[in-house]
């Protein structure tokens, strides 16, 4: 099956207006496009580490996420989603959940490269069935643009 850009862009928004992200922010564009990869009937559980994307898109009552959403601490988005996906598999196996779900986790470069790599590594080792998206915006943007270990040497963040 080929990719159809027009069809993809006409899909309903799963990352809706109402967030507080900066205009043109890469994390927003990333989240919108990743969610557009889902089929219309797909049910999804979204996990997000504390970071720019979370603090700007999940401020009650202005929630931008149309799917089920879980906020986790900065360093453990992967282990949180690993637990959720494992519980889902167990409940599905017991017949307590009938629907199929997709699991997607977002984390920034600081929360992934610096303090979240052990959680991501553990989830991969356990064979967690989810998609992990690291949006590398070059720094810890929600705390004053400190560099992360993903920031290129001599970059001005």
Predicted features and spans:
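Residues in the short beta-alpha loop(s) of Rossmann-like NAD(P)-binding domains
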Residues: 136
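Cofactor-binding active-site loop characterized by glycine-rich and histidine/acidic residues
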Residues: 2-132, 140-141, 145-155
């Amino acid at each position: 099956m080929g990719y159809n850009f027009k069809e993809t862009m006409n899909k309903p928004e799963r990352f809706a207006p109402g967030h507080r992200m900066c205009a043109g922010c890469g994390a927003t564009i990333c989240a919108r496009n990743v969610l557009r990869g889902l089929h219309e009937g797909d049910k999804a559980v979204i996990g997000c580490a504390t970071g720019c994307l979370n603090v700007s898109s999940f401020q009650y009552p202005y929630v931008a996420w149309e799917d089920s959403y879980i906020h986790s601490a900065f360093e453990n988005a992967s282990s949180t989603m690993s637990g959720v996906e494992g519980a889902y598999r167990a409940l599905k196996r017991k017949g307590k959940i009938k629907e199929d779900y997709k699991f997607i986790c977002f984390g920034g470069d600081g929360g992934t490269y610096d303090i979240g790599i052990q959680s991501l590594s553990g989830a991969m080792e356990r064979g967690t069935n989810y998609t992990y998206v690291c949006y590398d915006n070059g720094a810890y943007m929600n705390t004053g643009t400190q560099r992360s270990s993903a920031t290129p040497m001599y970059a001005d963040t």
